[in-house]
A protein has these predicted regions:
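Active-site acidic-Proline motif in GNAT/NAT acetyltransferases
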Residues: 97-99, 103, 131-132
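C-terminal "cap" of GNAT-fold acetyltransferases
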Residues: 25-28, 47, 58-59, 87-89, ...
Length: 169
């Protein structure tokens, strides 16, 4: 008989001591995905985990004491909210260690956001994804998100963000 041991990923709130590791992880994930080079202005925003504190819930995925993913969950009145409305929440800055892509960590973080929003009585989750990230579009559609074209927007010329939404039943 073959026994298979699997590692357990724990989703928990960000702690002060996590900030440097999460900043590096976010920067690496977004750069590896081709969203910017390390000197891009958006890189500073992605890297600024400390600046996001107090503007939403920062969750991390940890495995065997190593941070392998992170996400920010924010309400519609957060300065970080981009497309959510009063009865919605959204998550931002989803990042997974590039060496761990495809292992369910991103899905676990998204599910944690959805569960937290649902527990607060929020009926829907919204997100926006850059138009050139077809892999992310497929990922979110697989998780039950649908396009919300009326929420598409451009933070700056040439950067097209597509709105997505999921009902939290």
């Amino acid at each position: 008989m073959l026994l298979r041991l699997t590692r357990m990923v724990v989703i928990r709130a960000l702690r002060d001591e996590d900030v440097p590791a999460v900043s590096a992880l976010c920067l690496a994930a977004y750069a590896t995905a081709g969203h910017f080079d390390a000197n891009d202005a958006y890189a500073a925003s992605v890297r600024d985990v400390a600046g996001r504190r107090g503007h939403g819930d920062l969750l991390i995925a940890e495995e065997d004491g190593v941070i392998v993913g992170a996400v920010m969950l924010c309400s519609s009145d957060s300065e970080y909210a981009e497309v959510s409305r009063a009865d919605e929440m959204e998550f931002r800055f989803l990042a997974v260690d590039p060496q761990r892509w495809g292992q369910g960590i991103g899905e676990s973080l998204v599910m944690a956001c959805e569960e937290q929003a649902h527990a607060c009585g929020i009926p829907a989750m919204t997100i926006c994804v850059i138009d050139i990230n077809a892999a992310a579009h497929r990922f979110y559609e697989r998780l039950g998100y649908s396009r919300l074209p009326e929420r598409d927007w451009q933070p700056r010329p040439g950067v097209n963000l597509l709105g997505f939404q999921k009902a939290l039943d």
